[in-house]
Amino acid sequence: MNEFPKFKQADYPKLYLEQTDKDLVKILDPNFRYAYFKTIAKGGKSLIRSCKDLHLGRVVCYKSLLPEFADDPIEQKRLLREARVSAMLQHPNTMPTYELGRDRQGHCYFTMKLVHGYTFREIINYRERYDVTQLLDILIQVAYALEYAHTHGVVHRDIKPENILIGPFGEVLLLDW
């Protein structure tokens, strides 16, 4: 049976005291908070990128609408709803939202925890055989997230393997609320 690839040490940079003891600038300009963008994934209407949060010194996941949808008020509302629902669902199997804002062009975005993981689809496509216990564990964790969401009146309308992320520590995260 094939082993799933391990994560690289480079994905987790070391911390140094001089990075944590920097003074905070007098005026925090949200338009200059994020830099070093790198595309991770492209969805039907949105773009997912990693970038550096210059205020907190960490790499985050930055989600925004594709240019052709960025000015559409209906799509903006959907993106805002997704960000707020994700932020309100405080559960180990949901992705935490860090910030919601607008860029220099006035387009909506939100940032989330960046997890160096694989989607359930990637795992299914990679392996020839599966450990049923591991698959059940993934599905149970998804069920926990759904149960939590349902008790808060939230229904996930797009459950599919591409929206389930497995992190390097075995954590299972349900995405795209």
Model-predicted segments: where are they?
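Protein kinase glycine-rich loop
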Residues: 37-43, 48
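Conserved N-lobe loop of protein kinases adjacent to the ATP-binding glycine-rich P-loop
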Residues: 52-59
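AlphaC helix of the eukaryotic protein kinase fold
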Residues: 66-88
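Conserved short submotifs of the Hanks-type protein kinase catalytic core
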Residues: 105-119
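AlphaC helix of the protein kinase catalytic domain
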Residues: 120-130
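Activation segment signature within eukaryotic-like protein kinase domains
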Residues: 138-139
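Protein kinase catalytic-loop region centered on the HRD/HxD motif
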Residues: 144-154
